[in-house]
Amino acid sequence: ECWEDWDLIVNQLAKQEPFHKPGTAQGYHAMTFGFLLGEIIRRVDGRSVGTFFREEIADVFDIDFKIGIRENEFERCAEMIMQKAPINVINFARRIPRWLLPSRIRMIGDTLSSAEYRKAFIEILRSEDQIKNVTAFPNTPQWRKAEIPAANGHGSARGVAKFFSILSNGGSRNGQKLLNKETIDLATTEFSTGPDKVLFQGPYKFGLGYMLDAPLSPIGLENTMFGHTGIGGAAGFGDKVNKIGFAFVNNKQHGIGKLYRTANNLTKSLYKSL
């Protein structure tokens, strides 16, 4: 019930000490990154991140994407069908000596039980009821109305692809400027690389807010890509060399074995057509 209490969340974040010494490790900020940047926007501009995005970006460039939605917009939202936690895999991993496990299962088991993963994905749930009902939580009014910049944006594939297309074509569209080209170049420069202590120890590469290489996903299939993956198989990216934007969004999460398979196939077909 606290997701709509922005002040509570950012005040708790301000009190939080770094989980490891800055510069010594990479750990994906599944939730906190959006609140950190959103609070900077609010303090500089006065508007919430959702209002700022709507008035300065979505409305100006006709991008079908929102951060925090109103109740009269719920009818446009597809119900999320969440993938249940792989309990059988986890229980199997706990019973078998670690050295006998296949490397993929060992990696998953290590990550799901790690302190970094739990802090990023589990301990943010404030009650046992939320943990038990995590698969239904994204469909609740509280989640949809809250402004959670790193996690609960709502939009269409066309909207996400258009956003990345603008960035991939110099940052302007129809005489309106979204970002300077120099800013885009800086944001898509590599600043951090894995192994990521939250994301399965994978060799993820990040710019400023953008993934530059994300194992198993489309991002990184070409070294000219920048974008971000989504939990359950979604992905959006831009390509400044080929001047394209792409997005695949799904309301039913894909399981671990099929994760990003559809997005990868679509991406490969896209690049074959260029």
Report each predicted region and the residues it spans.
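Catalytic-loop motifs flanking and including active-site residues across diverse enzymes
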Residues: 29-36, 156-160
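Catalytic loop of the DD-peptidase/beta-lactamase superfamily, centered on the K-T-G motif
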Residues: 25, 42-60, 68, 72-274
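Short Gly/charged-rich anion-binding patches and loops
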Residues: 8, 36, 53
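Active-site-proximal loop and beta-strand segments within enzyme catalytic domains
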Residues: 1-31, 39, 45
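Conserved tyrosine-mediated DNA breakage-rejoining catalytic core shared by Y-recombinases
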Residues: 64
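Short hydrophobic "helix-edge" motifs at membrane interfaces and signal-peptide entry regions
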Residues: 36-37, 146
